[in-house]
């Protein structure tokens, strides 16, 4: 029984109770959101963990981080360190995107050491194994692809990015679109090559009901991958992207009817003046299910600083209804992130999420911001550290300058808080 089917029966599960407690809402609010598909709770029935999060309407914007091996860097211990950093810095979920030597071992390690929601992209492993077995990923059979999905579900993955919304109608729109960047999704490119080589429909689209049955058995959340997402601001909201979103909406309806929790993966590169429109289209076409975005990157000209461009776009998107932000690190478009990149990526994306969450007056983020402001006036460093998004950094700065009044701009003798306290009695 999935969380969604339980909710539709009027049952409030233990996971719904936990989400309600964390979010400061009623369990009934969470149950109703899950029943409608507006909230998902990534929690595979075969995986035990303490940290539960809800993603969707009326809840705080959540943050996802990425890790995983590759053929260029196959260091499982480094990926374990990255995963620990992700969790320590406050990520709500992670995705293991491994394509290195032993993908199974890497995934099992990630599931074992983490205590947050775990996601993956099954077509990555299926493609790597097809290269080993058939000499090319286009030799992958449909059964091999679905067997990989089922294996990863049975091992405990809480959510999966699966590129089911790629079909010939989307590729035909792409060919006519005059795009700058064509296909930038790794999973999307694998399946595009498979379709053209085999002259067949995408099996994840054609046999979508088979996919739903696999996911339903373990209550793994379906994240409909954005196989045709724009890879440049110039391509945002082109015909290919919109056609992909239309197909995603059709599949969303079928997932909801089957009682499978579902969210939509979005772009990517979106200029600020198109963020509201992008969000409105997704929510309208996809029945209000949660939107999981990869940024948004607000500009294309800042390699080395894409954690910042992503945070700018992510904050705007969160304000307009995005539910789940995938982090970007300074290494985006440059190479694989190291541990420092991961730390910076989570921190900046958490700032973006908080900027959106604080708009809910009286919510968790608002109350935290208010507590920080009051602590600054009172010069209560302990409370400031407790409410900081990066408490370790703040504490280290305070310890480095123990005699400081806390503000290098004014200094102790001209502190506005002191002036206000003395003459107005308001501090």
From Swiss-Prot:
<keyword id="KW-0004">4Fe-4S</keyword>
<keyword id="KW-0479">Metal-binding</keyword>
<keyword id="KW-0949">S-adenosyl-L-methionine</keyword>
<dbReference type="GO" id="GO:0009236">
    <property type="term" value="P:cobalamin biosynthetic process"/>
</dbReference>
<dbReference type="InterPro" id="IPR002817">
    <property type="entry name" value="ThiC/BzaA/B"/>
</dbReference>
<dbReference type="GO" id="GO:0016829">
    <property type="term" value="F:lyase activity"/>
</dbReference>
<dbReference type="GO" id="GO:0046872">
    <property type="term" value="F:metal ion binding"/>
</dbReference>
<keyword id="KW-0169">Cobalamin biosynthesis</keyword>
<comment type="similarity">
    <text>Belongs to the ThiC family. 5-hydroxybenzimidazole synthase subfamily.</text>
</comment>
<keyword id="KW-0411">Iron-sulfur</keyword>
<keyword id="KW-0408">Iron</keyword>
<dbReference type="GO" id="GO:0051539">
    <property type="term" value="F:4 iron, 4 sulfur cluster binding"/>
</dbReference>
<dbReference type="InterPro" id="IPR038521">
    <property type="entry name" value="ThiC/Bza_core_dom"/>
</dbReference>
<comment type="pathway">
    <text>Cofactor biosynthesis; adenosylcobalamin biosynthesis.</text>
</comment>
<dbReference type="Pfam" id="PF01964">
    <property type="entry name" value="ThiC_Rad_SAM"/>
</dbReference>
<protein>
    <recommendedName>
        <fullName>5-hydroxybenzimidazole synthase BzaB</fullName>
        <ecNumber>4.1.99.23</ecNumber>
    </recommendedName>
</protein>
<keyword id="KW-0862">Zinc</keyword>
<dbReference type="GO" id="GO:0009228">
    <property type="term" value="P:thiamine biosynthetic process"/>
</dbReference>
<comment type="function">
    <text>Together with BzaA, catalyzes the conversion of aminoimidazole ribotide (AIR) to 5-hydroxybenzimidazole (5-HBI) in a radical S-adenosyl-L-methionine (SAM)-dependent reaction. Is thus involved in the anaerobic biosynthesis of dimethylbenzimidazole (DMB), the lower axial ligand of vitamin B12 (cobalamin). Requires BzaA for catalytic activity, as BzaB alone displays no activity.</text>
</comment>
<keyword id="KW-0456">Lyase</keyword>
């Amino acid at each position: 029984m999935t969380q969604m089917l339980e909710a539709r029966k009027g049952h409030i599960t233990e996971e719904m109770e936990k989400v309600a407690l964390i979010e400061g809402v009623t369990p009934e609010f969470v149950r109703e959101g899950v029943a409608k598909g507006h909230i998902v709770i990534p929690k595979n029935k075969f995986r035990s963990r303490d940290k539960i999060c809800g993603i969707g309407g009326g809840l705080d914007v959540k943050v996802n981080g990425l890790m995983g091996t590759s053929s260029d860097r196959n260091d499982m211990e480094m990926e374990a360190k990255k995963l620990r950093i992700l969790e320590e810095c406050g990520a709500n979920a992670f995705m293991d995107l491994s394509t290195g030597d032993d993908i199974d071992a890497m995934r099992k390690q990630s599931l074992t050491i983490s205590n947050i929601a775990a996601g993956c992209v099954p077509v990555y492993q299926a493609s790597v194994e097809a290269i080993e077995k058939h000499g090319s990923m286009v030799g992958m059979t449909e059964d091999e692809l679905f067997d990989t999905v089922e294996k990863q579900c049975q091992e405990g993955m809480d959510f999966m990015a699966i590129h089911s919304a790629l079909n010939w109608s989307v590729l035909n729109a792409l060919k006519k679109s005059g795009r700058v960047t064509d296909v930038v999704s790794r999973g999307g490119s694998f399946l595009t090559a498979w379709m053209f080589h085999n002259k067949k429909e995408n099996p994840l689209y054609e046999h979508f009901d088979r996919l739903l049955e696999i996911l339903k058995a373990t209550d793994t959340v379906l994240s409909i991958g954005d196989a045709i997402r724009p890879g440049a601001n110039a391509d945002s909201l082109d015909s290919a992207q919109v056609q992909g979103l239309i197909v995603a909406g059709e599949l969303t309806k079928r997932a909801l009817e089957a009682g499978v929790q579902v969210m939509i993966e979005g772009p990517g590169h979106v200029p600020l003046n198109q963020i509201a429109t992008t969000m409105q289209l997704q929510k309208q076409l996809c029945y209000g299910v949660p939107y999981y975005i990869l940024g948004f990157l607000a500009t294309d000209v800042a390699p080395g600083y894409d954690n910042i461009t992503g945070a700018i776009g992510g904050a705007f998107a969160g304000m307009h209804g995005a539910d789940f932000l995938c982090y970007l690190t300074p290494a985006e478009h440059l190479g694989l992130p190291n541990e420092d990149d991961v730390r910076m990526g989570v921190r900046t994306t958490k700032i973006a999420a908080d900027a959106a969450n604080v708009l809910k007056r009286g919510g968790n983020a608002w109350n935290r911001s208010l507590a920080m402001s009051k602590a600054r006036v009172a010069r209560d460093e302990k409370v400031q550290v407790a409410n900081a998004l990066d408490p370790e950094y703040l504490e280290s700065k305070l310890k480095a300058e123990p005699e400081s009044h806390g503000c290098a701009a004014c200094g102790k003798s001209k502190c506005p808080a002191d002036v206000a306290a003395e003459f107005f009695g308001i501090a």
